Amino acid sequence: MLCLPGQINLQIPPNVIQGTGSVVTVAKDGTVSRGPANIGNIAPAIFTRKGDGTGAPAATASKNGQVFDILVANNDGTPVALDAGNYVSLFGTGFRFLSGPATITLGGTNIIPLFVGPQGQFAGLDQINFQIPLSLAGKGDADLVITLDAKTSNLVKMKIK
C-alpha cells in the first residue's frame, strides 16, 4: 500500500469476492474515509508518464524484442516517435486475469498482443507486449487502447515515425 496526499494505491487480494464493496481508510488523526469499489477480474488501466492516465504510456520499446531500452514518453508526458516494427512493453494494472482474447488498437489498427500478464517483479504490476505493425509507418500521432474481456482501458497517445 502507498498513501500520499490525495492518492492511495493498494492491491486487492485475489480471493476477494467480485462485486460492489467499499474501501475504508483511517488516517493517523483518526479521520475515517469511505469510498465505493467495484471489484472484478478485469479493469484494464494503462499507466502513463504523467501519472494521471493521460498522454503517453509508461512503457519501453525495443528494436529487436529482446532489449527494451527505448523510452516511449518524454518527461512532459508527450510521446516519443517510434519506428514501425518496434516492440513495445506497456505497463498497467487489471490485465492479468483475462479469460478471453486481448486486443490492442493503435491508430485504428487492431493488434494481437505477444504477451499479457503479470510483469513478474512488482506486486500488482501487469504488462502487455506488442509489435507496432509496419503498416503504421508514417502514421504520426496515434491513439492506443487495450480491450480485455470486452472492457476497454484508458486512451493513451503514441507517435509512429
Question: Which residue stretches match the model-derived regions?
Answer:
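A sequence-level detector for low-complexity, Ser/Thr- and acidic-rich stretches
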Residues: 1-161
